[in-house]
Design a protein with these regions (language model features):
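Conserved N-terminal/central alpha/beta ligand/cofactor-binding core
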Residues: 32-169
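Core beta-strand elements of the Rossmann-like FAD/NAD(P) dinucleotide-binding domain
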Residues: 2-4
């Protein structure tokens, strides 16, 4: 029997970043079916879009995304993601992610299809691998996180099964 405050299943960017945030509030057990770097994040190339420098604005980024989405995007979700992106980029940097920089120390931003401004942060053409590397390093160092590699989540017994109050985060 194993008890934990937070159970994270999967070791991609979402699982690892959640584990790091949750570890500030309790013990985290992270379960992954293979090695931690065996995930889709590790293979992502391109980069991450974020309003970083003027003349870019949240409004321009939201507009570009909605235009490219051709009516298939939820405008509220687009606005939330665009406005939170700089904060989440700061988290990735704090956890050790190294994005490419220009000789003067500014982030080297790319511009790709559908974007009217340079707003794509990247690490060479291996952005996902760099993010995964930094997150894994931070997770392995954190005293409140236990990692179980080569494990499967099959039968989970929660407080709900015991007839007690359970919350979802």
């Amino acid at each position: 029997t194993m008890k934990t405050d937070f159970l994270v299943i999967g070791s991609g960017a979402a699982g690892l970043s959640f584990a790091l945030k949750a570890a500030e509030h309790g013990h985290v057990t992270l379960v992954t079916k293979g090695k931690m770097d065996e995930c889709n994040t590790n293979y992502a190339q391109g980069g991450i879009c974020s309003v970083t420098y003027a003349p870019d604005t949240f409004e321009k980024h939201i507009h570009d995304t909605l235009v490219c989405g051709a009516g298939k995007c939820d405008p509220a979700a687009v606005e939330l993601v665009v406005r939170r992106a700089p904060e989440l980029i700061r988290d990735l940097i704090a956890w050790g992610t190294k994005f490419d920089k220009t000789p003067d120390g500014r982030f080297e931003l790319n511009r790709e299809g559908g974007h009217t401004e340079h707003r794509i942060l990247h690490h060479e053409d291996l952005t996902g691998a760099e993010i995964e590397r930094a997150l894994i390093t931070s997770v392995r160092k954190h005293p409140n996180i236990t990692v179980l590699e080569h494990h499967f989540a099959i039968d989970l017994l929660t407080q709900h099964h015991l007839g007690e109050f359970v919350t979802r985060h």
